[in-house]
């Protein structure tokens, strides 16, 4: 996913754009199926479902496994996914076509820049799973969850809407808690302002199951938008 985090001097990206290997099937899927399912990040916002559905957003959907599953579980919702890496977009499209799922739209562009252009309080749920942890100390300014970005996420949520996050890096989880607990308008779903159990709607992906086999702990966070 492509994020630009502003500092006082210049924009700092929270990603490195590595396209990686893309299969022939993914390439065809992007060419054939993306145009009908794409949201133009450079155009004025228009709700793809004409304000008739609650909207869920997943930022950085990776290979699309989680987004495809949750969209199938919530057929009456409008599900939007943001991902900068083309192989992941192709992978998601293949899953959607195979399942016949038609309630997903895709932003294949810079997430932070696009989110800043959206009107207030349009989203019922925002999901961010396993963002790049940037583990080295000199890299941590690239982490996605920073105060300015947290304020944007809060602004986009409807009152009562949820922000759900997960990471398997303890240090990053602690930073998320610090930043989000201090964000006006967000209330931690945990009474002690700590971590929560995995939400029922969060599907275990192959990535997470592999981490569990390796003994990686996963930290879940959940926040609600308050007036």
Curated annotation (Swiss-Prot):
<feature type="binding site">
    <location>
        <position position="136"/>
    </location>
    <ligand>
        <name>substrate</name>
    </ligand>
</feature>
<feature type="binding site">
    <location>
        <position position="110"/>
    </location>
    <ligand>
        <name>S-adenosyl-L-methionine</name>
    </ligand>
</feature>
<comment type="similarity">
    <text>Belongs to the class I-like SAM-binding methyltransferase superfamily. TrmB family.</text>
</comment>
<dbReference type="Pfam" id="PF02390">
    <property type="entry name" value="Methyltransf_4"/>
</dbReference>
<keyword id="KW-0819">tRNA processing</keyword>
<comment type="function">
    <text>Catalyzes the formation of N(7)-methylguanine at position 46 (m7G46) in tRNA.</text>
</comment>
<feature type="binding site">
    <location>
        <begin position="205"/>
        <end position="208"/>
    </location>
    <ligand>
        <name>substrate</name>
    </ligand>
</feature>
<dbReference type="InterPro" id="IPR029063">
    <property type="entry name" value="SAM-dependent_MTases_sf"/>
</dbReference>
<dbReference type="InterPro" id="IPR003358">
    <property type="entry name" value="tRNA_(Gua-N-7)_MeTrfase_Trmb"/>
</dbReference>
<feature type="binding site">
    <location>
        <position position="132"/>
    </location>
    <ligand>
        <name>S-adenosyl-L-methionine</name>
    </ligand>
</feature>
<dbReference type="GO" id="GO:0008176">
    <property type="term" value="F:tRNA (guanine(46)-N7)-methyltransferase activity"/>
</dbReference>
<comment type="pathway">
    <text>tRNA modification; N(7)-methylguanine-tRNA biosynthesis.</text>
</comment>
<dbReference type="InterPro" id="IPR055361">
    <property type="entry name" value="tRNA_methyltr_TrmB_bact"/>
</dbReference>
<dbReference type="GO" id="GO:0043527">
    <property type="term" value="C:tRNA methyltransferase complex"/>
</dbReference>
<feature type="binding site">
    <location>
        <position position="58"/>
    </location>
    <ligand>
        <name>S-adenosyl-L-methionine</name>
    </ligand>
</feature>
<keyword id="KW-0949">S-adenosyl-L-methionine</keyword>
<keyword id="KW-0489">Methyltransferase</keyword>
<feature type="binding site">
    <location>
        <position position="168"/>
    </location>
    <ligand>
        <name>substrate</name>
    </ligand>
</feature>
<keyword id="KW-0808">Transferase</keyword>
<feature type="binding site">
    <location>
        <position position="83"/>
    </location>
    <ligand>
        <name>S-adenosyl-L-methionine</name>
    </ligand>
</feature>
<feature type="active site">
    <location>
        <position position="132"/>
    </location>
</feature>
<protein>
    <recommendedName>
        <fullName>tRNA (guanine-N(7)-)-methyltransferase</fullName>
        <ecNumber>2.1.1.33</ecNumber>
    </recommendedName>
</protein>
């Amino acid at each position: 996913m492509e994020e630009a985090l502003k500092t006082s001097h210049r924009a700092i990206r929270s990603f490195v754009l590595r396209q990686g290997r893309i299969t022939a099937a993914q390439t065809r899927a992007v060419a054939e199926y993306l145009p009908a399912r794409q949201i133009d990040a450079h155009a004025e916002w228009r709700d793809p479902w004409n304000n008739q559905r609650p909207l869920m957003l997943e930022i950085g959907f990776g290979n699309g496994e989680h987004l495809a599953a949750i969209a199938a579980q919530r057929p009456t919702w409008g599900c939007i996914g943001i991902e900068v890496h083309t192989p992941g977009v192709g992978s998601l499209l293949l899953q959607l076509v195979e399942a016949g799922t038609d309630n997903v739209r895709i932003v294949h562009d810079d997430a932070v820049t696009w989110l800043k252009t959206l009107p207030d309080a349009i989203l019922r749920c925002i999901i961010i799973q396993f963002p790049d942890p940037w583990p080295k100390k000199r890299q941590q300014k690239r982490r996605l969850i920073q105060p300015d970005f947290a304020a944007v996420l809060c602004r986009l949520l409807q009152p009562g809407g949820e922000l759900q996050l997960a990471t398997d890096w303890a240090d990053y989880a602690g930073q998320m808690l610090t930043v989000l607990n201090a964000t006006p308008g967000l209330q931690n779903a945990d009474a002690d302002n700590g971590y929560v159990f995995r939400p029922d709607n969060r599907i275990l992906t192959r990535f997470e199951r592999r981490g569990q086999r390796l003994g990686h702990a996963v930290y879940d966070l959940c926040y609600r938008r308050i007036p």
